[in-house]
């Protein structure tokens, strides 16, 4: 979340950011509450000072055997006023906190300004989409023909947007996970295997709650949520901690299953692996010095790109516009892989710098020196990559006319075969 002091002293900056993001949060009402809060706080402090003065006078009179009854009654009245004002102050602060949690991050100055994804800017492309001398199939058609993906039986067992991976399909999924973790670990990322359930405070810390609760799977009768991404548990590993400067930067990579309700996506990508309720992903998470976080974003994006390059999958990098930027992000690059069945690029990774937005929510700080005042660090993360979408891209881009799928060279040591089918 944003710093309350920053919002109070820079209301026009925040209003402009909200406008660029097409946010309907009312900052004027929030600022009116802040003004009332400050007045009440001043009144409470004044009354407490008055109560302390009266209390001292009561003590003095009792010490000298003088009557203090009237002052005692006066002190009780002041105490009741303080309680009433503090109750009102608590209500206002609770209301303000709720609004503060609804205010999105302020876009970095380099983010393209625009209403939606149409304003996203292509930064670079890599590779050339393949020209087929036959009619290419969609990944779900390939998977069903090769009997490595079973959507029908998953639908029978669970419902729509679930999949059984079978045989070499399951092995391909597992190979990709190991390949990605190996490559990222070799670059200095420390591997983490996180819990797949977290409690509400963790979801608040990374920004999924309270705003996006309808997109989350909550475990009935508990305070647990199934994680939508490893970003949530890995970022919250350091929640409520003060790190030392020598610990930074921290780089983690983590494989996890991810669970998303996909509320509001009815009718979109209903077939195949593109938009599932459960999918696997390798996540990259960074904790950085504020002054270095944008360099860290560029390197994080390159690390995600390197996986696509080794797999020889054509892709492009898009800088998201203010209207398409995620709620918690200050700047995001999307990596979009070429999918022949769509005849276009589709998102396979989002790499974001949240600056101190998540760190404030999760209270993750660091000290530059042993006795220095703690500061909020910057958090970043990105998919490195989404496994199901990578499977989709491999099946479609590596399909052969005879129905087989060639295994990318980088994966052959993990798969032990050159072809699927």
Curated annotation (Swiss-Prot):
InterPro entries: aa-tRNA-synt_IIb (IPR002314), aa-tRNA-synth_II (IPR006195), aa-tRNA-synth_II/BPL/LPL (IPR045864), Ser-tRNA-ligase_type_1 (IPR002317), Ser-tRNA-synth_1_N (IPR015866), SerRS_1_N_sf (IPR042103), SerRS_core (IPR033729), tRNA-bd_arm (IPR010978)
Reactions accelerated catalytically: tRNA(Ser) + L-serine + ATP = L-seryl-tRNA(Ser) + AMP + diphosphate + H(+); tRNA(Sec) + L-serine + ATP = L-seryl-tRNA(Sec) + AMP + diphosphate + H(+)
Enzyme Commission numbers on file: 6.1.1.11
Pfam family, one: Seryl_tRNA_N
GO process annotations (BP): selenocysteine biosynthetic process; seryl-tRNA aminoacylation
Binding-site list for L-serine: 229-231, 283, 383
Chief location category: cytoplasm
Keywords, alphabetical: Aminoacyl-tRNA synthetase, ATP-binding, Cytoplasm, Ligase, Nucleotide-binding, Protein biosynthesis
Subcellular location, record wording: Cytoplasm
GO molecular function list: ATP binding; catalytic activity, acting on a protein; serine-tRNA ligase activity; transferase activity
Gene3D superfamilies per record: Bira Bifunctional Protein, Domain 2, Serine-tRNA synthetase, tRNA binding domain
Binding site for ATP: 260-262, 347-350
One GO cellular component term noted in the UniProt record for this chain: cytoplasm
The protein's annotated pathway: Aminoacyl-tRNA biosynthesis; selenocysteinyl-tRNA(Sec) biosynthesis; L-seryl-tRNA(Sec) from L-serine and tRNA(Sec): step 1/1
Comment block on domains: Consists of two distinct domains, a catalytic core and a N-terminal extension that is involved in tRNA binding.
Complex formation: Homodimer. The tRNA molecule binds across the dimer.
Role noted for this protein: Catalyzes the attachment of serine to tRNA(Ser). Is also able to aminoacylate tRNA(Sec) with serine, to form the misacylated tRNA L-seryl-tRNA(Sec), which will be further converted into selenocysteinyl-tRNA(Sec).
Annotated family: Belongs to the class-II aminoacyl-tRNA synthetase family. Type-1 seryl-tRNA synthetase subfamily.
Protein name: Serine--tRNA ligase
Organism: Desulfitobacterium hafniense (strain DSM 10664 / DCB-2)
């Amino acid at each position: 979340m944003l710093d309350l002091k920053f919002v109070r002293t820079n209301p026009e900056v925040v209003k402009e950011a909200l406008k660029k993001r097409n946010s309907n949060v009312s900052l004027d009402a929030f600022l009116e509450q802040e003004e009332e809060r400050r007045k009440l706080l001043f009144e409470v402090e004044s009354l407490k000072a008055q109560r302390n003065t009266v209390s001292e006078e009561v003590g003095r009179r009792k010490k000298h055997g003088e009557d203090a009854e009237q002052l005692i009654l006066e002190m009780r009245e002041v105490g009741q006023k303080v309680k009433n004002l503090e109750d009102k102050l608590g209500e206002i602060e609770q209301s303000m906190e709720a609004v503060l949690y609804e205010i999105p991050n302020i876009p970095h100055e380099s983010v393209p300004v625009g209403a939606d994804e149409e304003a996203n800017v292509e930064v670079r492309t890599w590779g050339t989409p393949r020209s087929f001398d036959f009619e290419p199939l969609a990944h779900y058609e390939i998977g069903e023909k090769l009997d490595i993906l079973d959507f029908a039986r998953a639908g029978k067992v669970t419902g729509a947007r679930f999949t059984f991976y079978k045989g070499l399909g399951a092995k391909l999924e597992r190979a990709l996970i190991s390949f990605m973790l190996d490559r990222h670990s070799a670059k200095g990322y420390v591997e983490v295997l996180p819990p797949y359930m977290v409690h509400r405070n963790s979801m608040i810390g990374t920004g999924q709650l309270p705003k996006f609760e309808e997109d989350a799977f909550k475990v009935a009768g508990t305070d647990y949520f199934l994680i939508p991404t490893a970003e949530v548990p890995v970022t919250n590993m350091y929640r409520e901690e003060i790190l030392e400067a020598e610990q930074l930067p921290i780089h983690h990579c983590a494989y996890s299953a991810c669970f998303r309700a996909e509320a509001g996506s009815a009718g979109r990508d209903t077939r195949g692996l593109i938009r599932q309720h459960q999918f696997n992903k390798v996540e990259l998470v960074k904790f950085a010095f504020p002054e270095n976080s944008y360099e860290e974003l560029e390197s994080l994006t390159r690390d995600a790109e390197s996986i696509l390059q080794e797999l020889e999958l054509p892709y492009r990098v898009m800088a998201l516009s203010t209207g398409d930027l995620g709620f918690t992000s200050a700047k995001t690059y999307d990596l979009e892989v070429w999918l022949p069945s769509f005849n276009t690029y589709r998102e396979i990774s989002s790499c974001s710098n949240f600056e101190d937005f998540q760190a404030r929510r999760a209270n993750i700080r660091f000290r530059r020196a042993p006795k220095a005042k703690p500061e909020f660090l910057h958090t970043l993360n990105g998919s490195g990559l989404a496994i199901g979408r990578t499977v989709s891209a491999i099946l479609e881009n590596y399909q052969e006319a005879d129905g087989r799928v060639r295994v990318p060279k980088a994966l052959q040591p993990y798969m032990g075969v050159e072809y699927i089918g």
